[in-house]
């Protein structure tokens, strides 16, 4: 199933995540998400800089530029190039993922996010 079909299917709804934590140390930004229910979609979005997403608990399906990247089971690291739209769907309950952004040299004060 592609991310566009998921976003249009009433069975799959974009939901606010119960827990998001932000930490910044020496220009490294970490955004940690806890996704309590499977089938929850972390909305498609894009950043102007490359980053990695660490799946630390559970499993997700990932998309990049509307094409599936496949299933990732914890522990897993997903590299997201700059300017690539990406999204995640929890395949299990209690997924924990962390996005790590190195902003050194980018001139940004925080990770810029544009949702679609």
Question: What are these language model-derived features?
Answer:
Residues 35, 46-62:
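Short, conserved beta-strand element in jelly-roll/cupin
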Residues 66-82:
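Short acidic-glycine-tyrosine-enriched beta hairpin
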Residues 21-23, 41-47, 64, 70-71, ...:
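Short histidine-centered beta-strand/loop micro-motifs
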Residues 40-42, 58-63, 77-78:
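Short beta-strand segments in beta-sandwich/barrel cores
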Residues 38-39, 83:
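Beta-strand-connecting loops/turns
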Residues 82-108:
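Ligand-binding loop in jelly-roll beta-barrel domains
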Residues 1-32, 42-43, 113-116:
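A short, N-terminal "cap"/entry segment at the start of jelly-roll beta-barrel domains
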């Amino acid at each position: 199933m592609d991310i566009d079909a998921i976003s249009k299917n009433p069975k799959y709804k974009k939901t606010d995540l119960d827990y998001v934590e932000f930490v910044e140390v020496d220009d490294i930004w970490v955004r940690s998400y806890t996704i309590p229910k499977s089938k929850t979609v972390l909305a498609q979005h894009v950043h102007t800089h490359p980053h990695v997403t660490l799946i630390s608990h559970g499993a997700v399906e990932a998309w990049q530029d509307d094409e599936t990247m496949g299933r990732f089971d914890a522990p897993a690291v997903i590299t997201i190039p700059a300017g690539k739209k990406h999204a995640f769907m929890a395949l299990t309950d209690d997924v924990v993922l962390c996005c790590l952004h190195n902003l050194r040299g980018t001139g940004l004060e925080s990770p810029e996010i544009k949702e679609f």
